[in-house]
Amino acid sequence: DNRRSRGLGDVYKRQDIHCGGNDLIFPHHENELAQSETAFENQQFAKYWLHNGMINLAGQKMSKSEGNIKLLNEYIDLYTGNVVRFFFLRAQYRKPQEFTEALLEESETTFNRLLEVVKDVESNPADQGFIEIFENSMNDDLNTPKFLGEVFEKINKIKDLNEQEEQEFKETLKYIFEILGFTFD
């Protein structure tokens, strides 16, 4: 009944971003969209719908029905939240990702390399050129792999920078990674 549907709008608020696996596009998210249009009187339920690729274990989709679920907290305890976050940013969010401890260890090594670069600086958006590189990557469908490529390309050439450029790059790098949810305590 229409009154009940309209009541949903009081419980479920409009969202900027609604996320889910790409296996939920149809019928789940299409039904959710149709129901929410009634609840919100034809107003937009979510500005953006993001559909991520599946996480695979040994080439098989991780799922409850397959009985191959890995709990994120276990890996955060083993590798830290920063390393797990870095692992997920190294691949485009819409593409499937293989999940292995070897890849987590590789992510840990790579993240520790980044950590060495930013450990002794303050967070500051000083390098506007690198801010623009970050913004362009995010505007390109949240292209974190592209951005990480730019990060490590510049880290590899850090010795070519003068002292001020190096400092501004390091401060900006820390600033950007804080935006992405990383902590540097």
Residues of each region from the PLM?
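Single conserved hydrophobic/aromatic residue that forms the stacking wall/gate
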Residues: 1-12
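Hydrophobic/aromatic-lined pockets within catalytic cores
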Residues: 10-13, 37-44, 88, 92-93, ...
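Catalytic cores of enzymes that engage adenine nucleotides and/or redox cofactors via long glycine-rich
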Residues: 13-78
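Short, mixed-charge aromatic SLiMs
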Residues: 27-31, 109-117, 171-184
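Catalytic adenosine-cofactor/nucleotide-binding cores of aminoacyl-tRNA synthetases and other
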Residues: 51-133, 140-143, 152, 156, ...
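Basic, alpha-helical terminal appendages of large translation-related enzymes
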Residues: 149-185
